[in-house]
């Protein structure tokens, strides 16, 4: 099988060069009191200076080495500079100990050539330590439509999966279906009442039932199928539950697909409660049995460190405190029934047994209390499997009130009866913004920040709307390239244009600034993946659009086709490169469309 061509991470490239210079200087005894062992432990840092006068990249590591070396930072930087092997890159010592790097034309040309050659694969890199990762997100109850918060987890989870894959990891995406417990019984009861109401009976919904109008639609579909002879009318609560469950799950899957969110696995909680054909034990019972054998369970009237309450009965506790939780947790009540935590334990045991090296769960802020107990569940079964829990804040929708002219929060939906659904956000005639805008704005902030979603801005067809601005930038590239091919008969080429002196023929600062921005794609993806920060790619896309439009406005192409064809060709290749990077970011990472005309 052919090896996948990979992109160059400029940060990793420079980091490796500085690390090698530290090793060489240390072996030559030129770094003062720094030992070879200490030299091997130095992890260089590469930054992009805020002022381009200080180079394209900078390394402040000599400043941090001063104490170990017992040398002045500037002296360390000068020593490392002598041992750097970076053809095509100029280095200088500045700022009392910084190593500054300026990429030369030959090096930039090689990287631009790589970008044009790799095309839709540009940005993909190998991970230094690739992992097999299970990423779980959304995981909603199949009792109602998905809400906007679920949409945020869907957008973040699917984008994070793309980021991890592009940066060299094997990722599987999973949706945990909460299809067991009392909520499912209530769903079936609610559907039965709606069916009886449609049949003319005067019967009220119980107070704790599901009141959304979506169940009326499901009841109508059920009666239509009964009338058509497709199925008989349910006669048991379980049959009503099963029909409602199938309808709701299908609806949720359709909504997620509409939002361009796919899953590799749909894991049913019911599997954890079903007895194993061989042992007769459910997955929950097997998990607790293993915890008992490992010494992590005990029976008591109160958790360790607390006095029993009057009349308390014995329950089975899990020693979650040993894994950092604030107190031990009940997994089996005195009556023999299992807690929700018991199912979570069995589920995470199943994840561990499937052989993943890292588990990532994306949860809403109302699940903050689960962090300690889930870490305990994974740690008890395997100290080697890493668990990350990403907690995200919720979303509020705002729209201008036509009567007052003020922004007001949109709380209610005609479709669901009590909240704005994800379907409403996508395609409701009054508040819908479409898939691209929904994904963009749901991805636009750090997960730990609440989102105030401006519905008016999301549908605005001006450059105030960042989705429109980035889409327009891609379409502008495509339109110009089409015109060059169709009207000007220019043949596009992926071979980088250089002068006779093997220099890039650029004349304006906007050209170089745009190229550096485009070449940063691999590092932008690596940083966003490592920091679990998809919103950083939103910022990167906005920066590309801004740099490209500055370039487009200041660096003309069409008049140069005859006046200076070499410069024109070099600028055309920057347009090609911009189109490619925007396409990769929009479609490959963010899950948006990339329009070719607007």
UniProtKB/Swiss-Prot annotation:
<dbReference type="Pfam" id="PF03485">
    <property type="entry name" value="Arg_tRNA_synt_N"/>
</dbReference>
<dbReference type="InterPro" id="IPR014729">
    <property type="entry name" value="Rossmann-like_a/b/a_fold"/>
</dbReference>
<keyword id="KW-0547">Nucleotide-binding</keyword>
<comment type="similarity">
    <text>Belongs to the class-I aminoacyl-tRNA synthetase family.</text>
</comment>
<dbReference type="InterPro" id="IPR008909">
    <property type="entry name" value="DALR_anticod-bd"/>
</dbReference>
<dbReference type="GO" id="GO:0005524">
    <property type="term" value="F:ATP binding"/>
</dbReference>
<dbReference type="GO" id="GO:0004814">
    <property type="term" value="F:arginine-tRNA ligase activity"/>
</dbReference>
<comment type="subunit">
    <text>Monomer.</text>
</comment>
<dbReference type="InterPro" id="IPR036695">
    <property type="entry name" value="Arg-tRNA-synth_N_sf"/>
</dbReference>
<keyword id="KW-0030">Aminoacyl-tRNA synthetase</keyword>
<dbReference type="Pfam" id="PF05746">
    <property type="entry name" value="DALR_1"/>
</dbReference>
<dbReference type="InterPro" id="IPR035684">
    <property type="entry name" value="ArgRS_core"/>
</dbReference>
<dbReference type="Pfam" id="PF00750">
    <property type="entry name" value="tRNA-synt_1d"/>
</dbReference>
<protein>
    <recommendedName>
        <fullName>Arginine--tRNA ligase</fullName>
        <ecNumber>6.1.1.19</ecNumber>
    </recommendedName>
</protein>
<keyword id="KW-0067">ATP-binding</keyword>
<feature type="short sequence motif" description="'HIGH' region">
    <location>
        <begin position="140"/>
        <end position="150"/>
    </location>
</feature>
<dbReference type="InterPro" id="IPR009080">
    <property type="entry name" value="tRNAsynth_Ia_anticodon-bd"/>
</dbReference>
<keyword id="KW-0436">Ligase</keyword>
<dbReference type="GO" id="GO:0006420">
    <property type="term" value="P:arginyl-tRNA aminoacylation"/>
</dbReference>
<keyword id="KW-0648">Protein biosynthesis</keyword>
<dbReference type="InterPro" id="IPR001278">
    <property type="entry name" value="Arg-tRNA-ligase"/>
</dbReference>
<dbReference type="InterPro" id="IPR001412">
    <property type="entry name" value="aa-tRNA-synth_I_CS"/>
</dbReference>
<dbReference type="InterPro" id="IPR005148">
    <property type="entry name" value="Arg-tRNA-synth_N"/>
</dbReference>
<dbReference type="GO" id="GO:0005737">
    <property type="term" value="C:cytoplasm"/>
</dbReference>
<keyword id="KW-0963">Cytoplasm</keyword>
